[in-house]
Amino acid sequence: MLGDGNAGMSTIPGLNQIQFEGFCRFIDQGLTEELYKFPKIEDTDQEIEFQLFVETYQLVEPLLKERDAVYESFTYSSELYVSAGLIWKSRGDMQEQTIFIGNIPLMNSLGTSIVNGIYRIVINQILQSPGIYYRSELGHNGISVYTGTIISDWGGRFELEIDRKARIWARVSRKQKVSILVLSAAMGSNLREILENICYPEIFLSFLTNKEKKKIGSKENAILEFYQQFACVGGDPVFSESLCKELQKKFFHQRCELGKIGRRNMNQRLNLNIPQNNTFLLPRDVLAAVDHLIGLKFGMGTLDDMNHLKNKRIRSVANLLQDQFGLALVRLENVIRGTICGAIRHKLMPTPQNLVTSTPLTTTYDSFFGLHPLSQVLDRTNPLTQIVHGRKLSYLGPGGLTGRTASFRVRDIHPSHYGRICPIDTSEGINVGLIGSLAIHARIGYWGSLESPFYEIFEKSKKVRMLYLSPSRDEYYMVAAGNSLALNQGSPEEQVVPTRYRQEFLTIAWEQVHLRSIFPFQYFSIGASLIPFIEHNDANRALMSSNMQRQAVPLVRSEKCIVGTGLEPQVALDSGVPAIAEHEGKIIYTDIDKIVLSGNGNTYSIPLIMYQRSNKNTCMHQKPQVGRGKCIKKGQVLADGAATVGGELALGKNILVAYMPWEGYNFEDAVLISERLIYRDIYTSFHIRKYEIQTHVTSQGPERITNEIPHLEARLLRNLDKNGIVMLGSWVETGDILVGKLTPQAAKESSYAPEDRLLRAILGIQVSTSKETCLKLPIGGRGRVIDVRWVQKKGGSSYNPETICVYISQKREIKVGDKVAGRHGNKGIVSKILPRQDMPYLQDGRPVDMVFNPLGVPSRMNVGQIFECSLGLAGGLLNRHYRIAPFDERYEQEASRKLVFSELYEASKQTANPWVFEPEYPGKSRIFDGRTGDPFEEPVLIGKPYILKLIHQVDDKVHGRSSGHYALVTQQPLRGRSKQGGQRVGEMEVWALEGFGVAHILQEMLTYKSDHIRARQEVLGTTIIGETIPNPEDAPESFRLLVRELRSLALELNHFVVSEKNFQINKKEA
């Protein structure tokens, strides 16, 4: 956030700032913190000592560039070097060397990491903050039961509770509880210290029996008693050092380590002044917690809201990378310790470089980025998706919640989310409410809390000062929720304003306000902030819209939206998709793949992205926007990327839409479109698919890449070059060979031809046999080969196989079955493509491009699309673009409607088209049926909304099966497009066929075409020779499976076959 202290104006922060700040914090602080924790390592005889000198660590600049790392499938990382010393105590000398510890993956300019050529991003996680929390529950007898839960930095917890007899317990597990006296004594306090440090000693003395005194008579007795209760050990355990270590490891380390954040929270909650560097739970903490618990029993003190953001902390990319670095150093310590012992045992002279290996650090980060739930493959469908992915917040992951156990209260919106977590943007399905998105202006504070900016109002002067508040601080202020000065500081303030105070919304006088919000979009995420007129939509539809905008496919010819919100340039800029000038100067050369800039006496070459595949198979491509000889400034857009125009986000198209029914073809969520969208390539997109194959070294020899493949038709091999790899620019169809490969295999003696056996017997020549394992183009993959990569790893062994990647580009026009959507949750499937002459047309003769169902608006309460539709029509006629801030009713009532009608009226006057704005039915117009030329009976709403084409396309989903694989157990066709599966004929499908009376078709569906093995085999032979297909006599395989499963439950089920000739009953074994 940038702010001017005098004017108090603010700008929107960098949308990738959260990721950059987290990684910089890890490099600047996290690395040194973990390196300082690395211990000095000695051998068993204490003759050799190994230590690291942290002050001299350095990270080397990467050898590879980002683009090369992606192209060659490497990791974009930096080598970490640290000085280490090996001290020989007997000789008194030290050997010091700079050692290589390992590679640390770096963050690139997009705020992501490149691991093995794949863009990955680390998601921020929301966890319960360590500390103590008090809550109350109604017991079985209707009396409130108060408990205090202490949560450690590791996520471990134990509870303090008071029973009906006023005895205080520490519940260490679900079934086991220990007296608070025993716990305090086991932590090192005696009875006298306990009674001196509590406010209610009489309650402790009331349940202090002679037996209890004996248990806490000494620290050893208390530890034995605590261990016996905690570990559920019978008998009389004996006090020993190993017992203390086990208790320390299993209980105190996991449940009593508070960390810095936990110590701060504990001090604030219990009014303690224990130093911040003392991060372990002390007896003083436990006794103060018990005092507060007793006070709650007597009606003093306050309970905690576990879902308040002040009781949560953000585990950012810095914390996750630091944890992994610490884990790698622990593994490195074990390796060094073992190596030193081995060197001493074999009487070798170790050196620091011989002791240290880079494997622990490299493998730890590889496994973290590849396997950790919070490390995800970056979604690169469009520029908006890239930005939003890095700003996600997840309650899931290690130490967090799970989708099946999280309660509704956790998922729900909380007042403390105001200005920090978007109340709209979340995932749909089982994880709803558990994966959120950061508000635009929110940032992560030093203590892991989410902070939001506000303007502080001074009564005497008109100056304002911007400050960031954590969730625990803004409860003490009255925050004006929606005042008009957020945009226009010069206008007079209203007398009464809506205000938020202590999680309640009030209406108070302006003089009582302490803070005010800084921006209308402050409460929303990026996805929700791109929805114009969002205040007129139901929140559920706004949620769908913010999710569907991330699914929009970049089009061949992108177009800026007529009606937007003003955030489009910021999103496009921060996504890194457009090429931006980093220096000012003059363009001296421009090409399709680079731009050369001359400035400050230097020449800069800016490479452009050409037909790069995203991980969602969309096409990333940059188009130069500046010509030779043009002078440019720093920060100017040089080239537009996918889904950007002029440096602004452009996900869809402004097209002419009518809201009316048309012959039932737009029933429910179906959409009728004009063929103009196809012929003019309005919704045409490019998709790039990647196909790869690996060559291994088998036990029979290495696999070969060749164009000489026996037993295959020549037309399938027509596109291969002399090396056996498909040629660039080739047009390939389904079934064509992309890479020819032969795998050697051992053949049996009987499989050899007679001439082969003769050669072996006379000359001893071994005739090799190979199996064809070529890479073939699957169904639906037809297209043009645009790139072929042969990635050869070092060694070339079976552990480092060679990989050949083939990239095929497809041009996809919009067709029936594709999904389209607006920005208000109005989605639909293309049901029919009409000729232009049959589409309804306007009074000026223009046919509409798309027809939506009007019944999809009122019931779903997303009226914002109507405002956008009408304003887009006015903007198209006036050649204007509008940027609308949300909640414009703060200025006056019906502000949105007045704006739309005034613009329509002006468009009607300037274009001399009275039908654009007719006072009898404003926003609507009489249109004509393209088939007959007759006007429709009622006026129809027409306009120009912004419609997106989504990635859910029919080419990826439609599938048909003629023959394929069957499941081994049920013998039914497999399910799924990827397995060449078939459609299951279930109960409802059987009922439908029964309703039509198609008995023979139904029998085929349930026997020949499904799981009747013998009948399936007979069908082929009888079809070839032209005989009738015999009726199956025994049961199908799924019925036999059911019988066997019932038998396993001790239920016998038999079936009988009645002969058609003599009606004899024959029992058949199922």
From Swiss-Prot:
GO terms for cellular component: chloroplast; DNA-directed RNA polymerase complex; mitochondrion. SUPFAM superfamilies: beta and beta-prime subunits of DNA dependent RNA-polymerase (SSF64484). GO terms for molecular function: DNA binding; DNA-directed RNA polymerase activity; ribonucleoside binding. It catalyses: RNA(n) + a ribonucleoside 5'-triphosphate = RNA(n+1) + diphosphate. It holds the Pfam family RNA_pol_Rpb2_6. GO terms for biological process: DNA-templated transcription. Gene3D superfamilies: 2.40.50.100, 2.40.50.150, 3.90.1100.10, DNA-directed RNA polymerase, beta subunit, external 1 domain (2.30.150.10), DNA-directed RNA polymerase, subunit 2, domain 6 (2.40.270.10), RNA polymerase alpha subunit dimerisation domain (3.90.1800.10), RNA polymerase Rpb2, domain 2 (3.90.1110.10). Keywords: Chloroplast, DNA-directed RNA polymerase, Nucleotidyltransferase, Plastid, Transcription, Transferase. Its main location: plastid. It comes from the Eukaryota. It is found in: Plastid, Chloroplast. Its EC number is 2.7.7.6. NCBIfam families: PRK00405.1 (NF001616). In plastids the minimal PEP RNA polymerase catalytic core is composed of four subunits: alpha, beta, beta', and beta''. When a (nuclear-encoded) sigma factor is associated with the core the holoenzyme is formed, which can initiate transcription. Belongs to the RNA polymerase beta chain family. DNA-dependent RNA polymerase catalyzes the transcription of DNA into RNA using the four ribonucleoside triphosphates as substrates. This is DNA-directed RNA polymerase subunit beta. It comes from Citrus sinensis (Sweet orange).
